[in-house]
Regions:
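Short, small/polar residue-rich loop motifs at catalytic or cofactor-binding pockets
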Residues: 2-4, 59-60
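Asp-based phosphoryl-transfer active-site loop
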Residues: 3-20, 42
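Active-site phosphate-binding/coordination module
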Residues: 24-113
């Protein structure tokens, strides 16, 4: 029986430098891990639009990518990708509580559309 494993990589501060270029040796290291029989995928806080280019640059063949801090899971569909799972919630309650306590703060909510 062949043993398989999964390696999940973050993007920011893990495979990328601050200038948004891949850290030296990342492409080669990912290829070595894949050649050793492991599946390599990305799991990141970034949106899919900001993640896809790194899936392509690294030549990843995994069928999934986890984006938006786990709120969106993308699944490969042939040569394209589809939203396989989207975790949503109504942010109004949380934003109301935060606004009461931190009225000068700014907040961002990512829309899955």
């Amino acid at each position: 029986m062949t043993r398989r494993g999964l390696v999940g990589l973050d993007i920011d501060g893990t495979i990328l430098l601050q200038d948004e270029t891949l850290s030296p040796g990342v492409i080669e290291a990912v290829a070595e891990v894949r050649d050793a029989g492991y599946e390599v995928m990305l799991a990141t806080g970034r949106s899919w639009m900001a993640t896809r280019r790194y899936v392509e640059q690294l030549g990843l063949t995994a069928d999934y990518a986890v984006c938006s801090n786990g709120a969106v899971t993308m699944r490969r569909d042939g040569d394209d990708w589809e939203r396989w799972h989207v975790e949503t919630f109504d942010p109004r309650t949380v934003l109301g509580l935060l606004g009461d306590r931190l009225p000068e703060a700014r907040y961002m909510v990512e829309l899955g559309s």
